[in-house]
Regions:
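Small-residue-biased structural context
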Residues: 1-132
Length: 133
């Protein structure tokens, strides 16, 4: 098995996770209470699996190999595309965590909106990102 096969399998796991994120957002929109603990688990999975484990492999190994073997085209694609999208996903996760912290202190609708917006932004951005890979 090639390392890229493992990374493709990780993409499948992440796609399943993203479907669950969107489903949870829909449940809240449909009137169910906002499950703070479940959204905290989203933050944890996003950081530990999607970012640390998966994006870490890309950033530490795959991207270097791509630049070595494909040259300037890969360098531009990685530095002006893939890494930018990784950082955007990280930003969505930070925003989600910040909104959760505010909501727990003061459960206002505006913070609930911020939670759903950050979670959906993360899910949409990462889904598009993986589809390009």
């Amino acid at each position: 098995m090639y390392s890229t096969d493992i990374m493709r399998a990780e993409h499948d796991h992440i796609f399943t996770f993203l479907k669950a994120v969107r489903a949870l957002c829909c449940q809240v929109l449909e009137g169910l209470p906002l499950p703070v603990d479940d959204f905290r688990k989203i933050v944890s999975f996003a950081r530990n699996y999607s970012d640390h484990q998966h994006h870490g492999k890309e950033e530490n190994f795959l991207f270097n190999e791509m630049v070595t073997n494909l040259g300037p085209i890969a360098d531009k694609l990685i530095n002006h595309g893939m890494l930018v999208e990784h950082d955007l996903c990280r930003r969505h996760v930070m925003d989600l965590e910040a909104a959760l912290n505010l909501y727990e202190k003061d459960p206002q609708t505006i913070y609930k909106l911020d939670i759903l917006t950050a979670a959906e932004g993360y899910a949409t951005t990462l889904h598009r990102h993986i589809s390009k890979e």
